[in-house]
UniProtKB/Swiss-Prot annotation:
Induction: The subglutinol cluster is highly expressed when mycelia and hyphae are transferred to fresh media for a 3 hour induction period, remaining expressed under conditions of heat shock. The cluster is repressed in cultures reaching stationary phase or in early germinating cultures, as well as under conditions of UV, salt and oxidative stress. Pfam families: BBE, FAD_binding_4. Residues 59-231 form the FAD-binding PCMH-type domain. GO terms for molecular function: FAD binding; oxidoreductase activity. The gene is subF. InterPro entries: BBE, FAD-bd_PCMH, FAD-bd_PCMH-like_sf, FAD-bd_PCMH_sub2, FAD-linked_Oxidoreductase, Oxid_FAD_bind_N. Its EC number is 1.1.1.-. This is FAD-linked oxidoreductase subF. Glycans are attached at N125, N193, N281. Residues 1-21 form the signal peptide. Keywords: FAD, Flavoprotein, Glycoprotein, Oxidoreductase, Signal.
C-alpha cells in the first residue's frame, strides 16, 4: 500500500471532538473526521493535554483538532477532511520543536500526532523502514537489537525522527556518517489531496529532494526508508573543562577552530559555553587510545583535563541522553517542558576578531544578565567531514559549505515567566557572530528555528540557495499551502499571497 498512489475517501462512522466546534465549518470538519473513522484526541482529557502542551511553553497554540492515527490511511483521510474544510495541517512526531511548529506555530491547525506510528523494521540487506513517529532512542535500540546496525542522528532520545530527518539530523557522529537525511533512500508521503505517494531518487524525485531538508512544507511523511551502517564496536565520548578566562578564550577558540579544519572524520565535537565557563565535549568513532592520539595536536594549545568514556553504540547513545534512564522511548511518552528562546547560525570559519567579540560578550553582557543561557559551537564542516561531501544542491539542506553551527538557548521553568530580555540576549549574540558576514554567507538550521524571524527572513536563512527550487516544487505538490507554518516554504506563485481562511471564517495567519 505504501507504494501506491490512491485517493482516500470517507469510511466508517466514528466520533470526534474539536475545539470551538460551533461554526458550520467546524461542524463539517468534525463530521468528515467522524465519517472517516479518524482517531481524535478529545479536548479536556489527559491525552489532549499531552498532545497540545508544547515542549516550549513560551509559545502555546490551540489546534482545531488533534488526529492520532495508527495507520497511513487515517492520515490521508484526516488530510482530505482538512483540505475540504480549508484547515491547515501540521505533522507532529516527537513534539520537540523549539518554536512549537509541531502545533502549527499558530492557532487553528489540524495536528497529525504521529507518535503511535513508531515501528522500526530492519531488513537483511541493512535497509530499515522507520515510521515517522518513532523517537530517536527507540530507533537506535531497535536497529541495534535487530541487527547491530545504526543510523546517524541527533543525541536527544525523545526527539521524533519525523521532523529530525525532514530538516537535517545533526549529531555527535555526523562528521563521520553525515546527517540523518543523507541516509534516506525513500519515503511514503501523504499529499495535500489525501493521495499517498512513494518517493525516491527514481520516483517523484523532485519531492524526494525537497523532503530532505524542508519536509514539513510538502506533506505528511508517514514512513522513511533508510540505509543503515554497521554499529561501531567502540565509540569514545569525552569532555574537557577548559580553564579559560576572557583574555585566553579567544586564542583557545581560534586554536580549536584551526585544529577542527583537518581533524579526522571520526571526531565530532562542540564547545559548550555557560555562565560557569567553557567546556569541550564530543565523541570519537573508535577506542580511547585512538581518541587520545587524535587530540594530541589540540590539547597542548587549549589546556584542561581530558575525561573519557569508551563503550559500544548503545552506550554512546545513553551517554548523550544526559541521565535519562530509558532511551527506548515509546508511547505514551511525555516531554520535558521549558519556557525558552533559541536562535543560532551556520557560518564559515570565524576570524580572531570575531572570537574576541564573542568572548567579550560572554564575559560582559551575557554574564551580567544572569539568565539560564547556554551556547554551543559545533563543528559542522572541515576537510574530512561527511556533511561537506555532497553539493549544496544535492538535497534541500542548503548548508554543506558551512563550517560552524551555533545554537543559543535561554530558558526558565514553565512555572516562571520568561524574561523579555532573553529575546534580546539571543539576538545580540547572533548578531555578534554574523555581523561580519554578508547576506548568503551564513544561514540557520531549520531544526533550530528562531521564533523572532519574519517568514521571509526564516525562509532565506533556512534554505538559502535552494529556496527558489523549493518554492517551485511546493507549487506542484501543495499549491494551496495546506502544509504550512509561519516560516514554511511558500509556493512560487503564492509567495506574497495570504493563505486561504477557514470556510465561514476570517483568520489572521
Amino acid at each position: 500500500m505504501t507504494r501506491l498512489s490512491l485517493q482516500i475517501i470517507a469510511g466508517l462512522a466514528g466520533q470526534a471532538w474539536l475545539v470551538n466546534s460551533d461554526t458550520p465549518s467546524h461542524d463539517a470538519f468534525a463530521s468528515c473526521l467522524s465519517d472517516a473513522s479518524v482517531p481524535i484526541a478529545t479536548k479536556g482529557t489527559p491525552e489532549w493535554t499531552q498532545h497540545t502542551t508544547p515542549f516550549n511553553t513560551r509559545l502555546q497554540y490551540e489546534p482545531i483538532a488533534v488526529a492520532v492515527p495508527t495507520e497511513i490511511s487515517q492520515i490521508a483521510a484526516a488530510v482530505t477532511c482538512a483540505k475540504t474544510n480549508g484547515i491547515p495541517v501540521t505533522a507532529k512526531s516527537g513534539g520537540h520543536s523549539f518554536t512549537s511548529l509541531g502545533l502549527g506555530g499558530e492557532d487553528g491547525h489540524l495536528v497529525i500526532q504521529l507518535d503511535r506510528m513508531y515501528n522500526v523494521e530492519l531488513a537483511q540487506n541493512g535497509t530499515a523502514m522507520i515510521q515517522a513517529g518513532a523517537r530517536l532512542g527507540h530507533v537506535a535500540v531497535e536497529l541495534y537489537n535487530q541487527g547491530k546496525r545504526a543510523l546517524s542522528h541527533g543525541y536527544c532520545p525523545a526527539v521524533g525522527v519525523g521532523g529530525h530527518a525532514a530538516h537535517g539530523g545533526y549529531g555527535m557522529v555526523s562528521r563521520k556518517y553525515g546527517l540523518t537525511l543523507d541516509w534516506m533512500k525513500d519515503a511514503t508521503v501523504v499529499l495535500h489531496n489525501g493521495t499517498i505517494v512513494y518517493c525516491s531518487e527514481s520516483e517523484h524525485s523532485d519531492l524526494f529532494w525537497a523532503i530532505r531538508g524542508a519536509g514539513s512544507s510538502f506533506g505528511i511523511v508517514a514512513e522513511y526508508g533508510f540505509e543503515t551502517f554497521p554499529a561501531p564496536e567502540k565509540v569514545t565520548n569525552f569532555g574537557i573543562v577548559l580553564d579559560w578566562n576572557p583574555e585566553t578564550a579567544p586564542a583557545g577558540l581560534l586554536a580549536f577552530q584551526d585544529f577542527a579544519q583537518t581533524m579526522p572524520s571520526e571526531l565530532s565535537c562542540q564547545i559548550d559555553v555557560r555562565s560557569t565557563g567553557y567546556t569541550l565535549n564530543g565523541s570519537y568513532v573508535g577506542n580511547e587510545a585512538s581518541l587520545r592520539e587524535a587530540l594530541v595536536p589540540l590539547l597542548g594549545k587549549i589546556g584542561g583535563h581530558l575525561e573519557v568514556h569508551e563503550g559500544n553504540w548503545l552506550e554512546y547513545v545513553k551517554f548523550w541522553a544526559l541521565g535519562q534512564p530509558n532511551i527506548d522511548i515509546t508511547p505514551p511518552a511525555d516531554n520535558v517542558h521549558l519556557s525558552l528562546y533559541t536562535t543560532g547560525a551556520l557560518t564559515p570559519s570565524l576570524s580572531a576578531n570575531q572570537f574576541r567579540s564573542f568572548a567579550d560578550y560572554i564575559a560582559t553582557d551575557a554574564i551580567k544578565r544572569g539568565n539560564s543561557w547556554s551556547i554551543q559551537m559545533f563543528i559542522h564542516g572541515g576537510q574530512y567531514s561527511a556533511i561537506s561531501g555532497p553539493k549544496i544542491t544535492d538535497t534541500a539542506y542548503a548548508h554543506r559549505d558551512k563550517f560552524l553551527i551555533f545554537q543559543f538557548t535561554d530558558f526558565v521553568w514553565p512555572s516562571q515567566e520568561y524574561p523579555e530580555d532573553g529575546l534580546a540576549l539571543g539576538r545580540e549574540f547572533r548578531d555578534i557572530i554574523t555581523n561580519s558576514f554578508t547576506n548568503g554567507q551564513w544561514g540557520m538550521y531549520a531544526n533550530v528555528p528562531d521564533s523572532q524571524l519574519s517568514s521571509g527572513e526564516a525562509q532565506k536563512l533556512y534554505w538559502g540557495k535552494n529556496l527558489e527550487r523549493l518554492e517551485t516544487i511546493k507549487a506542484k505538490y501543495d499549491p494551496n499551502n495546506l502544509f504550512r507554518n509561519p516560516q514554511s516554504v511558500k509556493a512560487a506563485a503564492r509567495c506574497a499571497t495570504r493563505p486561504l481562511p477557514l470556510q465561514g471564517q476570517s483568520l489572521l495567519f
